[in-house]
Amino acid sequence: MKKYLVIIVFLFMLAAVLWRAYDVFWLRHRYLITAYCDCPICINVPEFRDGKFANLRPIHWGGVAAAKSVPFGSDVELVPVTLRDLLAVRNFLGGRRHFTVEDRGGKIHDRHIDIFFPQSRGGHQAAVRWGARRMRVKINGRLME
C-alpha cells in the first residue's frame, strides 16, 4: 500500500512540474487581448470618436487595434489556450476568432491586441466584462512567437 502511495505522489508531482513547464512555455508566446468601445472612457481623445477606425473605415464589429508593426488589413486569429479563454471566445465573441486590424491605439504596443465592441455587441459593458486576457495569436495565418 505504501508503495502505491509513493507512486501516486510521484505521479502528481511529475504532472505538476510538466504542467508548469507547459504553462511557462505558452505564457512566453501569449498576447494581451483587451477590449474597447467608442465611448469617452475607452477613447479619451474627442477627435478620435468620429465613428471611424484609424484606417478611415467606419467602425464595425470585427475590427481590432494592433501595434504599428502589424499592417492594416492583417487577419488576426485568437488561439485560446485555456478553457477559460475558450469559453470567453464563445460567450463574449459569439465564437468569432478572426478579426481584421483596422485601428491603432496610444497604449497598443508589441504583443497587444484590442478588440472593438460596438454598441450592438454590448459596447462598454461587454468590453469591461471581457477584461484583459492572454492568448496565443495567429497573424495572417502565422502563429506568433
Model regions: which residues?
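Positively charged n-region of N-terminal signal peptides that target proteins for export
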Residues: M1-Y4
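Hydrophobic membrane-insertion alpha-helices, especially the h-region
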Residues: V6-W19
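Solvent-exposed, well-ordered loop and adjacent helix/strand elements within mature globular domains
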Residues: W19-E145
